Amino acid sequence: MREKKLLTHSEFQVMRILWNLPAQSGFTGEILARYEDPKPAYTTLATFLKILTNKGFVKFKKKGSKLFYTPTISQAEYADTFLSPVKDTFFHGSLQEMMRFFLRKENLSEGEVNDLIQLIHEVQGK
């Protein structure tokens, strides 16, 4: 099993772009094009990609003279790595307590509440 590692803010930005790229996109220039301004320098992005590769979050293939990057972990898998310890540490492992905390803290619209109720009904139907 992969050692659980957390991403820095800058690394997470790169991963978020990679998770949302179309399947045939993944060259450094394509990743850079997805950044909002201010964009990092090309060499800075290349450094982030090298770090992410070393951490095991990204793999690459050489295509011609360029490197093609793909994530090795899905966004959902990373979210679990990040959120499970929060649930365990702050909410004694209880998803119900974690949800209760956020539902009381957030000011949800009626539509958002209805969406959550619908989601609960979908889960109950499984």
What are these regions (language model features)?
Residues 8-10, 63-82:
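Short, cationic-aromatic polyanion-contact patches
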